[in-house]
Amino acid sequence: DNTPWLFKAPGGESMRHVFERMQMTVDAIVRANPGRVIAAASHGCAIRNYLCYALGWPLERIADVCWCDNTAVSLIEFDGGFRPHPVYLNDASHLPEHASTFATQSWWRQGAEHAASAVK
């Protein structure tokens, strides 16, 4: 599908709702903890939605956000106005290859080179 931003699981929330929910939730957490280091964990779809927002992109660019390996780490700093500034995204260098969920899969590589270059 060439329009992942229009996806809505039957009986579930729309991609737009996930995008907005993640934005509001992370914003509330950051505002409640100014100047503190925060660790948050979620599932891939929610993470990609937030990274799309943090990069300053509209939801329609969700396909440009790379998929991440399980336990990948992204670092996002927030300025005084609580605006996100990604430092790095989807770092899985701590994983040995045998522990990587992506090492033996290829479905996620489709367009990965394009998405990686979009962040630079």
Language-model features: locations:
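A generic secondary-structure signal
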Residues: M24-A32
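Generic beta-sheet signal
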Residues: I29, R36-G44
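Glycine-rich phosphate-binding loops at beta-strand->alpha-helix junctions
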Residues: A46-Y50
